[in-house]
């Protein structure tokens, strides 16, 4: 890689480290191209990205931003990143269960080093979509109760009229 390209890539990585709220570093050695492509697709659907990085350039980018560095940049490393806190850990840990050769080595949350335990805790949280769904269902409860209560007198009236008609006949 040319020196100018390396400088561009370091700037690109610095942008990722600044803008992404969650970054998960993985060892991808042993994964097929199809498996990596599937991980990328699943991440892309949820608004996240996967980038294979050169360790030296990743270390330089982290050092330039004065982020405390963990020893995660060794071997074949890819970083999955997103502005969402929960998406990346959920997708990556799901694939780590599915593909034993994929190893999560650490990451960064809000430009601070995250351990495997931190990443697992983030993955166990509910997504914002599920929170929105729960909130909307809570909003519907009073409306449903009102509909049921207002519908009950009509049902009773119809039942009384049916009984009256049946008794007359």
UniProtKB/Swiss-Prot annotation:
GO terms for biological process: translation. One of its GO terms (cellular component) is large ribosomal subunit. Coiled coil: none annotated. The keyword NADP does not apply. InterPro entries: Ribosomal_uL10, Ribosomal_uL10-like_sf, Ribosomal_uL10_bac, Ribosomal_uL10_bac_type, Ribosomal_uL10_CS_bac. Keywords: Ribonucleoprotein, Ribosomal protein, RNA-binding, rRNA-binding. It comes from the Bacteria. Pfam families: Ribosomal_L10. SUPFAM superfamilies: Ribosomal protein L10-like (SSF160369). One of its GO terms (molecular function) is structural constituent of ribosome. Forms part of the ribosomal stalk, playing a central role in the interaction of the ribosome with GTP-bound translation factors. HAMAP family: Ribosomal_uL10. PANTHER family: 39S RIBOSOMAL PROTEIN L10, MITOCHONDRIAL (PTHR11560). Belongs to the universal ribosomal protein uL10 family. Part of the ribosomal stalk of the 50S ribosomal subunit. The N-terminus interacts with L11 and the large rRNA to form the base of the stalk. The C-terminus forms an elongated spine to which L12 dimers bind in a sequential fashion forming a multimeric L10(L12)X complex. NCBIfam families: PRK00099.1-1. This is Large ribosomal subunit protein uL10. It comes from Orientia tsutsugamushi (strain Boryong). The gene is rplJ.
């Amino acid at each position: 890689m040319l020196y100018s390209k390396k400088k561009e890539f370091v700037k690109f990585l610095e942008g990722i480290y600044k803008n992404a709220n969650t970054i998960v570093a993985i060892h991808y050695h042993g994964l097929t191209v199809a498996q990596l492509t599937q991980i990328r697709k699943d991440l892309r659907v949820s608004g996240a990205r996967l980038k294979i990085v050169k360790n030296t350039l990743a270390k330089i980018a982290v050092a330039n931003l004065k982020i405390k560095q963990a020893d995660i940049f060794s071997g074949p490393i890819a970083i999955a990143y997103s502005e969402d806190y929960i998406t990346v850990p959920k997708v990556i840990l799901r694939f780590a269960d599915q593909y034993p050769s994929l190893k999560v080595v650490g990451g960064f949350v809000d430009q601070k080093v995250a351990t495997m335990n931190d990443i697992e805790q983030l993955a166990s949280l509910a997504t914002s979509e599920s929170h929105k769904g729960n909130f909307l269902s809570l909003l519907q409860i009073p409306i449903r109760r009102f509909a049921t209560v207002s519908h009950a007198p009509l049902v009773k009236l119809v039942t009384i009229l049916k009984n009256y008609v049946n008794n007359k006949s």
